[in-house]
Amino acid sequence: MFPRDVRIESYDPELAKAIAAETQRQEDHVELIASENYTSPAVMEAQGSQLTNKYAEGYPGKRYYGGCEYVDIAEQLAIDRLKQLFGADYANVQPHSGSQANQAVYFALLQPGDTILGMSLAHGGHLTHGAKVNASGKLFNAVQYGVNDQGLIDYDEVERLALEHKPKMVVAGFSAYSQVIDWARFRAIADKVGAYLFVDMAHVAGLVAAGVYPSPLEHAHVVTSTTHKTLRGPRGGIIVAKGAGEDLVKKLQSIVFPGIQGGPLMHVIAGKAVAFKEALEPGFKAYQQQVVKNAQAMANTLIARGYKIVSGGTQNHLMLVDMIGKDVSGKDAEAALGKAHITVNKNSVPNDPRSPFVTSGLRLGTPAVTTRGYVEQDCVDLANWIADVLDAPSDDAVIARVRDAVSAQCRKYPVYG
């Protein structure tokens, strides 16, 4: 029997110390990594529940284990809410991550060696869209498209590559692109060569759910996402579709289980159900609208301070700062900003002369700060502090001044009040 009064603090003080330190770091540092956000206490409560004890291979009503009647309720809630959120008629909430959701789509619809056409990682795509270092670039013949000199997706290039290489699947989506994607144009290109259109909307799923960013579900054969980032849920993946035929649904269901996964993480699925309920609340739309307003305020301020934003600005939650020609690298900028309690990530930019471990760019995003309660003026201030540090990354006095300002701002907007 486990006594209920045993806590990590008393049983494992080393781990407790690390958890406490990370909790404090999240309160004291401003989070600008575009793929990060804060979950609600209710989501964390679900993730820490006894549902973690239950093995539940299969799907609701069709399990390979007994005793699943209550986890069936939890998973069905997640499925139904997810469908409602995106206007989908198919939803799978079992993928452990966005990468595994993407893997499921590839394995369901392709054969090893088939050609896929995806966005280059160096131009704003994702590892799982055909990067050579990823399984998607090893198992499949990956052809990559990019952005033009204005930092915009070159749809003419996408079409030319599609007509030349005849991919079986066109992949749309990104990890570092700040404009609106023309999903209809992608579908038209895919249709020209008889390819599936697969959309990875991981970064903008919350914006899509709130109607702040165009939905790909009207155009794509299948769509995946993570459940954190702008959706503000637990770390995990989902697959959704609208108008998918019975054959496609059967392939997707069977590839997730038993194809690439065994037992689902029922505690995480419960957390997803909570997050989807939160995303259906009226306030979620206002939150996502503010995310975009904050990103635009930050981008415009950085531009005014002399920093280039790839594509010239942002229409979503993120921006890519291009520092080619600047004395500071992305790696050094990340470190300097970290000393000022501003958390960002270095990121390659188009035609980057530096290696992916060094880079000439920074990716910034506003989902997390908006969750804290930041509005436009806060993000203008924050962008000016970022520019101050980037202008003098080795100046300890500047870093100390910015750190003090950031600390005051963080105290004004606690993550968990």
Swiss-Prot record:
(6S)-5,6,7,8-tetrahydrofolate binds at residues 121, 125-127, 355-357. Pathway: One-carbon metabolism; tetrahydrofolate interconversion; Amino-acid biosynthesis; glycine biosynthesis; glycine from L-serine: step 1/1. SUPFAM superfamilies: PLP-dependent transferases. Catalyzes the reversible interconversion of serine and glycine with tetrahydrofolate (THF) serving as the one-carbon carrier. This reaction serves as the major source of one-carbon groups required for the biosynthesis of purines, thymidylate, methionine, and other important biomolecules. Also exhibits THF-independent aldolase activity toward beta-hydroxyamino acids, producing glycine and aldehydes, via a retro-aldol mechanism. It comes from the Bacteria. Belongs to the SHMT family. Pfam families: SHMT (PF00464). The modification N6-(pyridoxal phosphate)lysine is found at residue 229. The keyword Transcription regulation does not apply. GO terms for biological process: glycine biosynthetic process from serine; tetrahydrofolate interconversion. It is found in: Cytoplasm. It catalyses: (6R)-5,10-methylene-5,6,7,8-tetrahydrofolate + glycine + H2O = (6S)-5,6,7,8-tetrahydrofolate + L-serine. This is Serine hydroxymethyltransferase. GO terms for cellular component: cytosol. Its EC number is 2.1.2.1. Homodimer. Keywords: Amino-acid biosynthesis, Cytoplasm, One-carbon metabolism, Pyridoxal phosphate, Transferase. The lineage of its organism: Bacteria, Pseudomonadati, Pseudomonadota, Gammaproteobacteria, Lysobacterales. The record marks 228 as: Plays an important role in substrate specificity. Its cofactor is pyridoxal 5'-phosphate. GO terms for molecular function: glycine hydroxymethyltransferase activity; pyridoxal phosphate binding. The keyword Glycosyltransferase does not apply.
